[in-house]
Amino acid sequence: MWTQPGGYVLIGEGYWKRKAPSDYLAVLGGNEQEYFDHRGNVQAGIDAGLVPMHAVVASDDEWDEYEWKYARSIERFVREQPDDPDAVTMLDRIRRWRDGYLRWGRDTLGFGAYLFYRPGIRTT
């Protein structure tokens, strides 16, 4: 278990807002079973014997901020390190990722933070 009895666990996890298109799954390099929906994330904690205390999801604006900063950092790195042997691969990957986010990701995948309590008496 991740924490002692009487302790808390804070988990950040993606969740499906809707059924993921197969083209988006290909961009992610994954499958539908990698994530639950928001309720499923809470239920997974309950199934692990934890008590949900709070949950919050990122807004579209917050998700955009994260994705654009991620893409921008890779673009900047490649621009500043053009001789890096992985530069072309990195640039290709981030541009496919960004296109996938704009086509499908923003409406399909969300991000939540989940606070759980582990029942029991703390021993330390």
Q: Residues of each region from the PLM?
A:
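Short alpha-helix
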Residues: Q33-A55
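Conserved Class I S-adenosyl-L-methionine
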Residues: H54-T124
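Glycine-rich loops and low-complexity Gly/Arg-rich segments
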Residues: G6, Q33-H38, F77-P82
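Short, conserved beta-strand edge motifs with alternating hydrophobic and charged residues
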Residues: L10-E13, H54-V56
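A short glycine-rich, Lys/Arg-flanked "PGG" loop and its adjoining helix->strand segment in the class I
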Residues: M1-Y8
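Short gly/pro-enriched beta-turn/loop segments at secondary-structure junctions
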Residues: V9, H38-R39, L109
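Short amphipathic alpha-helical segments, especially helix-boundary/capping motifs
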Residues: W2, Y15-A20, A87-D92
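Short, glycine-/aromatic-enriched active-site segment of Class I SAM-dependent methyltransferases
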Residues: I11-E32
